[in-house]
Design a protein with these regions (language model features):
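Structural signal for conserved beta-strand scaffold positions within catalytic alpha/beta enzyme cores
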Residues: 75, 121-123, 212, 336, ...
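Conserved C-terminal alpha-helix-loop-beta "cap" of PLP-dependent enzymes
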Residues: 286-441, 448-462
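Conserved PLP-enzyme active-site core in the AAT-like
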Residues: 4-11, 31-33, 70, 80-297
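Conserved N-terminal alpha-helix of the aminotransferase class I/II PLP-enzyme fold
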Residues: 37-79
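Short, compositionally biased
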Residues: 116, 121, 455-466
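N-terminal glycine-rich, Lys/His-bearing helix-loop that initiates the first secondary-structure elements
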Residues: 1-36, 427, 431, 463-464, ...
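Short glycine-rich or small-residue beta-strand-to-loop segments that form or flank ligand, phosphate
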Residues: 47, 74-76, 154-157, 309, ...
Length: 477
């Protein structure tokens, strides 16, 4: 149990009456549990202030920094989104240049919009056998930085949504040789570096700014995250200023207690929990090697443990079909589905039953595929079109993100959008990585493939299904 939760619980048992916010006054309101109300307070005496920490919150952030090997750490209650916005805003001047992976989260693009940045993209290589993208390599970074003009900062995602880990140590050396900072969105790697058998985290590898979603892979509440800073390439006062802007002025003590509790669990039980987690996961992978149709991304030196990538390409099925079968027949809710695979996440929060159910279900599905029970939706519909990943395309940039997003726009049929300028982000969600960014020219391949994704029931944001498929574009003059 974390120190902040203990203090909140003890306070709730006193006779002090709250003549202050929040409005529920620690009383039962509707059907929410009383326990939540009891510890949901504001910045009252004795509980510090996240925006000017001096006591318990300062101490907890210092403990987080020691745990991750950072010089300074900040609690975030607005998720990693807040951390990414603050990191990019602090590292890159308004109107500056950012070199970033095309696979960046939409919050990175939002930062570029807000700060009117010019973006240069790094395009990850496709792992063809598994239909997923690898992490950005040091060679790609070196090649990009050899060109002029040199950006003001580099922004990477590691691990990727699918668990691919970049060689941050080498990349940091290359980036720093140019005198610029490295920002790593490590939202999916809050567990890294915390136990034997896990890869190092990016703080330990020399990154200047690192963002962790504590809730993604550790036992914390949704929306809780951390931002770490190292070295002298980042103005700390400037970083704090942007955190004040992007972070709520009424930070949730429930969420902060959750961060503290999760990190306390790691400190007290992490060795045992992570060892058990790795044993269970590897045992599951061994059993799943019996599958003849489904395949799984193997654990190599650059693959994060816990991300089970269920590849359905060889079976002739879409990732969405496997996702739907697991949900509807076996009541197993996965993280996401993509055209050629789906993703199940495992953490120290999973017991042996979670591994058994997933193993049994996938082995049964694999047997059903062999027996011809499942057929691809394309074959069912009489469609046999070759699919291309839209992330492989390098759309022509016709306007900056800020220009396009602020321009007058209109909604038109997707089939009529070829050659037009995208007026909004279009992405598969999750994870929210854009296939089209405002200001980019829409190609015929975009229109055709987006329509295919929608027919496969993939969650495409930025294209509506009202009165046929429609997309937002910049209005012609």
């Amino acid at each position: 149990m974390g120190e902040l939760y203990r203090r909140l619980k003890a306070y709730s048992e006193t006779d002090e009456y709250p003549y202050h916010m929040p409005g529920h006054k620690r009383q039962v309101c509707g059907e929410l549990p009383q326990e939540i109300m009891n510890i949901d307070i504001t910045e009252i005496d004795g509980f510090d202030n996240l925006h000017a920490p001096e006591e318990i919150l300062l101490r907890l952030q210092e403990e987080a920094a020691r745990l991750y090997g950072a010089e300074e750490s900040f609690y975030l209650v607005n998720g990693s989104t807040c951390g990414v916005l603050a990191a990019i805003s602090a590292a890159v001047p308004k109107g500056g240049r950012l070199l970033m992976t095309r696979g960046g989260h939409k919050s990175a693009y939002h930062a570029a919009y807000l700060r009117n940045l010019t973006i240069s993209y790094l395009y990850p290589e496709m792992m063809q056998e598994y239909d997923i993208y690898d992490a950005i390599t040091p060679e790609q970074i070196a090649e990009a930085l050899a060109k002029e003009p040199v950006p003001d900062a580099v922004f990477l995602v590691s691990p990727t949504y699918e668990g691919r880990i970049a060689d941050i140590e080498k990349i940091a050396q290359i980036v720093h040789s140019k005198g610029i900072p490295l920002i790593v969105d490590e939202a999916h790697g809050a567990h890294l570096g915390l136990a034997e058998g896990l890869a190092k985290n990016s703080c330990q590898c020399g990154a200047d700014l690192v963002i962790h979603s504590v809730h993604k892979t550790l036992p914390a509440l949704t929306q809780s995250a951390l931002l770490h800073v190292n070295g002298n390439r980042i103005d700390r006062d400037r970083l704090r200023r942007f955190l004040h802007i992007y972070q709520s002025s009424s930070p949730s003590y429930v969420l902060m207690a959750g961060i503290d509790n999760a990190l306390q669990v790691v400190k007290e039980q992490g060795g045992y929990l992570f060892a058990k987690f790795q044993i269970n996961y590897l045992r599951m992978l061994t059993k799943l090697s019996e599958c003849r149709n489904l395949s799984f991304l193997p654990l190599d030196a650059r693959q994060d443990i816990g991300k089970l990538i269920i590849v359905s390409v060889k079976a002739g099925l879409s990732g969405q079909q496997i996702y739907d079968i697991l949900l509807k027949k076996y009541h197993l809710q996965l993280e996401m589905a993509a055209p050629g695979y789906c993703l199940a996440m495992f953490t120290i929060g999973d017991g042996e039953e979670a591994y058994r159910r997933m193993t049994d279900a996938l082995l049964a599905i694999d047997r059903d595929i062999t027996a011809g029970k499942w057929q691809s939706r394309q074959k069912q519909d009489g469609r046999e079109e070759e699919e291309i990943s839209l992330y492989q395309l390098h759309p022509e940039v016709r306007m900056s993100i800020a220009q396009a997003w602020d321009a007058e726009k209109e909604e038109i049929p997707l089939s009529q959008a070829v050659g037009r300028i995208a007026g909004d982000f279009v992405n598969l969600y999750p994870p929210g990585i854009p296939v089209l960014v405002p200001g980019e020219q829409i190609e015929e391949t975009h229109c055709r493939q987006l329509a295919e994704y929608l027919k496969e029931d993939l969650n495409v944001q930025g294209v509506t299904k009202d009165a046929g498929y429609r997309i937002t574009v910049v209005k012609n003059e």
